[in-house]
Amino acid sequence: MYEQEKKMLAEAAIKQVKNGMILGLGTGSTTRSFIDALGEWVKAGGEVQGVATSNETVEQAKRLNIPLLSLEEATHIDLVIDGIDQIDPRFRVLKGGGGALFREKVVALMSREILYLADASKFVHHLTGPLPVEIDAFARPYVERYLRDKQLDVTLREHDGQPFVTDGGHLILDVDLERVQDVRHFAQELKSLTGVLETGYFERQPDHVLTVEQGKVRQLAHPNLRDGGGLV
């Protein structure tokens, strides 16, 4: 996504923020742009509290003097604002490219409303992945063998030539979904495996998605919502 588009989405997302809200703050490059904008909003006198989904987000929020709550301290979460990896016409979503899928999913499940930010490339007819699968390191051989027995392409996520390790101390396997017919069922199947903590298929779908079309920010509403979205 171009930096200008990220900035446009961040500015549009700020319009959804109200004084007194508790916000779920996602992880990733698109969300970083929003948190930068939120920092300016707080600096100008806005009052919110955030629940961060990663150590990276905690550090950024602290630098910008955005007040944070732990998950235990948050009585509720009003709105999650985060990025996505893929979304299909039924608003089924893949996330976890930034490596924070488990915490992002917990925060999303606790939130009253979800707003995702996405450029046009994130919209697909079918979810093709890769699907991030967060696993305990000890279970890696077992889970990899299970997936390869299904003729699926599996890649251990790396960072700087070493296995990527999540904030929770786990590994991530990225699974190609080209041969998977039913992603929801497949994600549930994976969750039943010993050693699998979570997958990047999000059962809780967003209420709205902000995207950029022809140089303008557009808000898309979940198919089950009555408001049809529109230009922001």
Curated annotation (Swiss-Prot):
HAMAP family: Rib_5P_isom_A (MF_00170). One of its GO terms (biological process) is D-ribose metabolic process. Keywords: Isomerase. Belongs to the ribose 5-phosphate isomerase family. It catalyses: aldehydo-D-ribose 5-phosphate = D-ribulose 5-phosphate. GO terms for molecular function: ribose-5-phosphate isomerase activity. It comes from the Bacteria. PANTHER family: RIBOSE-5-PHOSPHATE ISOMERASE. Catalyzes the reversible conversion of ribose-5-phosphate to ribulose 5-phosphate. Gene3D superfamilies: 3.30.70.260, 3.40.50.1360. It comes from Exiguobacterium sibiricum (strain DSM 17290 / CCUG 55495 / CIP 109462 / JCM 13490 / 255-15). Homodimer. Pfam families: Rib_5-P_isom_A. Pathway: Carbohydrate degradation; pentose phosphate pathway; D-ribose 5-phosphate from D-ribulose 5-phosphate (non-oxidative stage): step 1/1. CDD domains: RPI_A. The active site is at E104. GO terms for cellular component: cytosol. This is Ribose-5-phosphate isomerase A. Substrate binds at T27, G28, S29, T30, D82, G83, I84, D85, K95, G96, G97, G98, K122. Disulfide bonds: none annotated. Its EC number is 5.3.1.6.
